[in-house]
């Protein structure tokens, strides 16, 4: 089951709204049985992304947590987990990026960039398209 929601926090205010963010994550954690949580990498330099990472780590203690790669924000990145993608997966990802209306003019939001990163990660593991993640917490590894 995939779930998502949009919360209307103002940009660059999550650190001052940290407790509310944690409370919302805690409520989600209590009302759902998540197998895996995706969040910004622990190496992400953006202040809001750091807050999300910290509060996800606190709230979802019993879930696998993977940090996603955002090269324009990451100081460095550990490519611990590699997941093969299809072209349909990549097209769906590009479509989802359209939800970030305020970011659409940024170079890293274009389809070519998404494809280039997927191809680069694929080269590392002998696949056509791959997304890599930082293993923040792994529960019951395969």
Locate the predicted segments by residue.
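Active-site beta-strand->loop->alpha-helix modules in alpha/beta enzyme cores, enriched
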Residues: 1-64, 120-121, 125-128
């Amino acid at each position: 089951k995939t779930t998502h929601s949009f919360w209307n926090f103002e940009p660059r205010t999550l650190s001052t709204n940290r407790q509310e963010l944690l409370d919302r994550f805690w409520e989600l954690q209590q009302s759902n049985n998540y197998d895996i949580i995706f969040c910004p990498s622990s190496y992400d330099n953006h202040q809001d992304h750091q807050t999300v990472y910290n509060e996800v780590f606190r709230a979802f203690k019993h879930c696998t947590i993977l940090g996603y790669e955002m090269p324009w924000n990451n100081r460095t990145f550990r490519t611990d987990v590699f997941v093969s993608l299809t072209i349909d997966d990549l097209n769906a990802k590009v479509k989802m990026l359209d939800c970030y209306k305020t970011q659409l003019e940024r170079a890293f939001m274009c389809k070519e960039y998404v494809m280039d990163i997927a191809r680069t990660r694929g080269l590392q593991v002998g696949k056509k398209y791959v997304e890599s993640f930082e293993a923040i917490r792994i529960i019951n590894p395969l």
